[in-house]
Amino acid sequence: MAKKVVKMVKLQIPAGKANPAPPVGPALGQAQVNIPSFCSQFNETTKDQMGFIIPVIISVYEDRTFTFVTKTPPASDLLKKAAKIDAGSANAKQTKVATISKSQLQEIANLKLRDLNAYSVEQACKIIAGTARNMGILIED
């Protein structure tokens, strides 16, 4: 018989840098999870993605055990890295802060495809292009 899930915790943690300090400690402490165990497992799983923020969904069971699923980094982080900028535009409609190529957009869409609500790379490209537009990033052909 399957274990009963008592709590789902969603966090965004820098890859390879989970520690018991906030926000990880308080969120998992409330769920009565072994925090050092989670931190070591998360850091081991995400050590190859250093420099990105990784969304994670933690399922906590009745017996205080847990499992977690990592997602792909947020599209905005991937776009900022591709455009080599620190932040998006404060006024995206009038001020463009950077440009990226269609090939860079497709790379990001391929990476994000499994987490997006899209069945094809073309649909994923449109979703990522919308995020880029809202950040003030121009896409050139």
Swiss-Prot record:
One Pfam family this sequence matches: Ribosomal_L11_N
Post-translational modification: One or more lysine residues are methylated.
Record has Ribonucleoprotein as a keyword: yes
Keywords, alphabetical: Methylation, Ribonucleoprotein, Ribosomal protein, RNA-binding, rRNA-binding
Taxonomy, superkingdom: Bacteria
Sample GO molecular function, one term: large ribosomal subunit rRNA binding
InterPro entries: Ribosomal_uL11 (IPR000911), Ribosomal_uL11_bac-typ (IPR006519), Ribosomal_uL11_C (IPR020783), Ribosomal_uL11_C_sf (IPR036769), Ribosomal_uL11_CS (IPR020785), Ribosomal_uL11_N (IPR020784), Ribosomal_uL11_N_sf (IPR036796)
GO biological process, one term: translation
Presence of keyword rRNA-binding: yes
Disulfide bond sites: none
One Gene Ontology cellular component annotation held by this UniProt entry: cytosolic large ribosomal subunit
Similarity comment: family membership: Belongs to the universal ribosomal protein uL11 family.
NCBIfam families recorded: L11_bact
UniProt function note: Forms part of the ribosomal stalk which helps the ribosome interact with GTP-bound translation factors.
Description of how the protein assembles with itself and partners: Part of the ribosomal stalk of the 50S ribosomal subunit. Interacts with L10 and the large rRNA to form the base of the stalk. L10 forms an elongated spine to which L12 dimers bind in a sequential fashion forming a multimeric L10(L12)X complex.
Name this protein carries in UniProt: Large ribosomal subunit protein uL11
Organism: Phytoplasma australiense
Lineage: Bacteria, Bacillati, Mycoplasmatota, Mollicutes, Acholeplasmatales
